[in-house]
């Protein structure tokens, strides 16, 4: 089945090398050499597609859950400056030096983030967390996939954002952060790299 799916849009493209739905070319290398290769299988049922975001704590991929038959987002714990990965490999390795304690502390925080966000269930403007697991010397959070445009990409294409538009983007973020803070949780990774603008 994986060979018939487009690794960008997850439509069934059949044996075509170029997806007739989105134009993605099968076998396209990841944008960064340390990203997982599209087509990689995680936990025996998540097919990794293209990376859709990268922040200080990790890489987010668009993936296909073969068990449920739905597109999900998978955030991989990949803390910048602490780990590396050879192109085409799945496992991460710690950079040299005394990074083990720092890595373990951040990994624990990453997994606690998954548990914390999962308690919000279907709260408006907060992405649902479905599951999390450890593999490949790192960890993964399985989340709801939100179809939209990254704020970073929007700003790069459109330039300056009009004040009314900015307020419409920022207001739901403020409301979501209020809900999170009310539970004693601090979101440490709010940035244009992980804010989606959706319809």
PLM segments and residue spans:
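Activation segment signature within eukaryotic-like protein kinase domains
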Residues: 169-170
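Activation-loop N-terminal segment of eukaryotic-like protein kinases
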Residues: 197-199
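Conserved short submotifs of the Hanks-type protein kinase catalytic core
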Residues: 136-150, 154
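Conserved N-lobe loop of protein kinases adjacent to the ATP-binding glycine-rich P-loop
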Residues: 64-72, 78-82
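Activation-segment/catalytic-loop signature of the eukaryotic protein kinase fold
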Residues: 132
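AlphaC helix of the eukaryotic protein kinase fold
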Residues: 86-119
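Protein kinase glycine-rich loop
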Residues: 49-55, 60
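Protein kinase catalytic-loop region centered on the HRD/HxD motif
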Residues: 173-185
